[in-house]
Design a protein with these regions (language model features):
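Beta-rich strand-turn-strand
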Residues: 133-136, 147
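Acidic-aromatic substrate-binding/catalytic surfaces of carbohydrate-active enzymes
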Residues: 20-80
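Asparagine-centered strand-capping/turn motif at beta-strand->loop junctions
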Residues: 27, 141-147, 286
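Hydrophobic small-molecule pocket/channel-lining residues, especially in calycin-type beta-barrels
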Residues: 31, 41-43, 53, 116-123, ...
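Beta-strand-rich recognition/accessory modules
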Residues: 1-23, 30, 40, 111-117, ...
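Short, hydrophobic/aromatic beta-strand segments
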Residues: 36-38, 149-155, 293-295
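Extended, loop-rich substrate-binding clefts of extracytoplasmic carbohydrate-active enzymes
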Residues: 4, 9, 77-134
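Active-site/ligand-binding surface loops and adjacent short beta/alpha elements
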Residues: 150-152, 156, 160-235
Length: 306
């Protein structure tokens, strides 16, 4: 399938992905960042801040930023690393991944530059395949060590999900797990046995998480299902009102209509020897949520009954 590369008015080239059922996605070369994913009813499923700065070298608030080679401030580099602030290239040799002929996809690559080597002196190739199929968006990141010595890194795909009202959202699949609370100097806690709900700022890294997490939007009767491999942690973030007002690239009230649930490898950095490659995978899909006695039953989603 030929690539639909568009040069938009904001000056940021992007690849448009479409598939027969009518869903679509947009992927910027800047940051290798997915900035739109719409379902077959043309409803936007990803959150994008109305104040997002679409101008390098700023990071873009929304969509699915790629955090590499550092997540957050866990290191000496800029917040969340530099991959989200670099212009990627189309990857004409994406082997050894199998062909994605049966779906709409794009392969991108980011290689270390002389400028990056000054701040992170490690030679690498970061590849990302974004694939769109009916009701599903799949991202496959790969990192290859092209250096002469081993290196380690942390990584995350930050999923800004569009929700109707954060106070009506709950997350299933992270119950009873340990997490680091970034609002408490990364102190370690154990989550309660109930689903996660939101009534204030949340910034947590959940550890050793399952491969499937459900994000249930009561008001829209829609459930996001996040499946992931190679990224054992999950980051859950919402800035709430005070933090949102302090963010220059986010409107004061927009925290109500977004939630970040990230696929991440944070607690234990990934170590690659020369010429070794790491591969992750994340799959986002949506299902209609059914009510029972006024409550959604995400257990069916988590057990794969949908």
């Amino acid at each position: 399938m030929p690539l639909n590369l568009v040069h938009a008015s904001d000056g940021l080239p992007r690849v448009l992905l479409t598939e027969p059922s009518g869903s679509s996605a947009e992927v910027l070369l800047y940051g290798g960042q997915v900035v739109s994913w719409k379902n077959d009813r043309r409803e936007e499923l990803l959150f994008m801040s109305s104040k997002a700065i679409l101008k390098p070298p700023k990071a873009i608030r929304g969509g699915i930023p790629v955090c590499f080679p550092q997540f957050g401030n866990l290191g000496s580099l800029e917040q969340h690393g530099f991959a989200r602030n670099r212009v990627w290239s189309l990857d004409n040799n994406p082997s050894p991944l199998p062909s994605a002929d049966n779906q709409s996809s794009v392969d991108l690559i980011l290689k270390s530059t002389e400028e990056d080597l000054k701040t992170w002196p490690r030679s690498f190739e970061l590849r990302l395949r974004v694939s769109l199929s009916a009701g599903k968006l799949t991202l496959i990141p790969r990192v290859r060590n092209t250096d002469s010595k081993a290196f380690s890194f942390t990584f995350a795909l930050t999923n800004y999900l569009s929700v109707s009202d954060i106070s009506e959202v709950r997350v299933e699949g992270l119950e009873t797990l340990d997490y680091f609370d970034n609002l408490m100097q990364r102190e370690r806690f154990t989550e309660q046995a109930d689903a996660i709900t939101f009534d204030g700022e949340t910034d947590r890294v959940y550890l050793s998480t399952p491969t499937k997490i459900a994000i249930i939007d009561h008001e829209k009767k829609r459930t996001f299902v996040l499946r992931k491999d190679g990224m054992p942690d999950a980051v859950v973030w919402n800035p709430w009102d005070k933090k949102a007002k302090a963010l220059s690239d986010m409107s004061d009230e927009e925290y109500k209509t977004m939630l970040c649930v990230d696929s991440a490898a944070v607690e234990t950095p990934i170590v690659l020897k020369p010429f070794e490659e790491w591969k992750g995978r994340q799959e986002l899909s949506t299902v209609s949520s059914s009510y029972y006695s006024g409550q959604l039953d995400p257990r069916k989603v988590l057990r794969g009954f949908h």
